[in-house]
Amino acid sequence: MKIELASSYGFCFGVKRAIKIAENAGDAATIGPLIHNNEEISRLEKNYNVKTLEGIDELKDEKKAIIRTHGITKNDLAELKKTDIKVIDATCPFVTKPQQICEKMSEEGYDVVIFGDMHHPEVKGVKSYAKGNVYVVLEESELEGIKFKQKVALVSQTTRKVEKFMQIANYLMLHVKELRVFNTICNATFENQEAAKNLAKRADVMIIIGGKNSSNTKQLYLISKNFCEDSYLIESEEELERSWFDGKNLCGISAGASTPDWIIQKVVDRIKKV
């Protein structure tokens, strides 16, 4: 059986940057998981004493606090800056962008629509920067019945599917007088999704590696599943099952933006032994 990696996969710029920031900081606490990958979070805690807290209220004797890649709410950031703790910002610059857009557009009188998961930390942070009406949706149907102002601004969670974002934009174009569309989907997300789709079209089995709480990894899995029925989402090589590969000729592999190369290599090595 041949094993082929997608042409684009794994660690993105924002995650690489955040990992380096955390390693350089050492002896610190992150506000929420730095990234959505439990294996890498454990490595940072073990090797660099970077622990994970659920929120700013858990800070006690820490000297340094690292803001996660997904960002935190505007209010939490303001509260954090009132303390004597050194604040180290590892928010991905691609996440900072929709935060700034929401703040600016709401100040200019626009209603703001965020395409994304309202429970995701990135979306919670982005939403907190809007000062007026703000709506978080995943489906066009959720927009029905909303009485918008004349002006609406649309942004996206950075890890969503472009096609779905365009559907939301098209709906709004038909229902509001003025629409500002800001494509805030990360380029790395788009490239990884396209690469996974192209590989899944040819593969007999697809393995998607990443945190099961990771939005971009889930999107990769769903895209892969559309084109390759035998697609599986795993966090480590321990989840692989021999039966998945029976009678298969091509095994495709992709990985989420928070998945380090060392985990990917472990999966590849295990599959080679099947």
From Swiss-Prot:
The keyword Iron applies. GO terms for molecular function: 4 iron, 4 sulfur cluster binding; 4-hydroxy-3-methylbut-2-enyl diphosphate reductase activity; metal ion binding. One of its GO terms (biological process) is isopentenyl diphosphate biosynthetic process, methylerythritol 4-phosphate pathway. Isopentenyl diphosphate binds at residues 36, 70, 120, 214-216, 258. (2E)-4-hydroxy-3-methylbut-2-enyl diphosphate binds at residues 36, 70, 120, 158, 214-216, 258. Pathway: Isoprenoid biosynthesis; dimethylallyl diphosphate biosynthesis; dimethylallyl diphosphate from (2E)-4-hydroxy-3-methylbutenyl diphosphate: step 1/1; Isoprenoid biosynthesis; isopentenyl diphosphate biosynthesis via DXP pathway; isopentenyl diphosphate from 1-deoxy-D-xylulose 5-phosphate: step 6/6. It holds the Pfam family LYTB. Belongs to the IspH family. This is 4-hydroxy-3-methylbut-2-enyl diphosphate reductase. HAMAP family: IspH (MF_00191). It comes from the Bacteria. Dimethylallyl diphosphate binds at residues 36, 70, 120, 214-216, 258. It comes from Campylobacter concisus (strain 13826). Keywords: 4Fe-4S, Iron, Iron-sulfur, Isoprene biosynthesis, Metal-binding, Oxidoreductase. It catalyses: isopentenyl diphosphate + 2 oxidized [2Fe-2S]-[ferredoxin] + H2O = (2E)-4-hydroxy-3-methylbut-2-enyl diphosphate + 2 reduced [2Fe-2S]-[ferredoxin] + 2 H(+); dimethylallyl diphosphate + 2 oxidized [2Fe-2S]-[ferredoxin] + H2O = (2E)-4-hydroxy-3-methylbut-2-enyl diphosphate + 2 reduced [2Fe-2S]-[ferredoxin] + 2 H(+). [4Fe-4S] cluster binds at residues 12, 92, 186. Its cofactor is [4Fe-4S] cluster. PANTHER family: 4-HYDROXY-3-METHYLBUT-2-ENYL DIPHOSPHATE REDUCTASE. Its EC number is 1.17.7.4. Catalyzes the conversion of 1-hydroxy-2-methyl-2-(E)-butenyl 4-diphosphate (HMBPP) into a mixture of isopentenyl diphosphate (IPP) and dimethylallyl diphosphate (DMAPP). Acts in the terminal step of the DOXP/MEP pathway for isoprenoid precursor biosynthesis. The lineage of its organism: Bacteria, Pseudomonadati, Campylobacterota, Epsilonproteobacteria, Campylobacterales. The active site is at 122 (proton donor). Binds 1 [4Fe-4S] cluster per subunit.
